[in-house]
Swiss-Prot record:
Keywords: Cytoplasm, Endonuclease, Hydrolase, Magnesium, Metal-binding, Nuclease. Binds 1 Mg(2+) ion per subunit. May bind a second metal ion at a regulatory site, or after substrate binding. The gene is rnhA. It catalyses: Endonucleolytic cleavage to 5'-phosphomonoester. Its EC number is 3.1.26.4. GO terms for biological process: DNA replication, removal of RNA primer. Its cofactor is Mg(2+). Belongs to the RNase H family. GO terms for molecular function: magnesium ion binding; nucleic acid binding; RNA-DNA hybrid ribonuclease activity. This is Ribonuclease H. Coiled coil: none annotated. It is an enzyme of class 3 (hydrolase). Residues 1-147 form the RNase H type-1 domain.
Amino acid sequence: MKVTIYTDGAARGNPDGPGGYGTILSYIDSTGVEHIREYSGGYKKTTNNRMELMAAIVGLEALTKPCVVTLYSDSQYVVKAFNEHWLDGWIKKGWKRGKNEPVKNVDLWKRLLAAKNQHDVTFCWVKGHDGHPQNERCDVLATTAADGGNLADDNVVE
């Protein structure tokens, strides 16, 4: 099945403020009917990058069988990690980057890799806040979650 996932993350007072993610999952079933699911959640203290990662994770983890996925994100951090093979280098170096510095958000990168490996995923960058309807909707989901009262603890903030 072909699935399209749109994602966005937001953080207020980055890096130690509340944050949220928004994800839209869209597919057309065998009868030609389009299905759209929206997901969002918020955390008390987090970063924008962690929320961008969570948005992608939630979208991929929502899939119950292997799919061909096109995932759109306005996060160059997420998209370039795959498309420019940053992740390959980080893994080869034992989750180190550049001058032997530890990679941030390793817990979420590992979770995203595990979710991605179940599918054939293409990561595509979309310019944020540029009128792309699904990206704008994900932004609303993410910021609403960040501003909400039901925020979870993000136990790893780097």
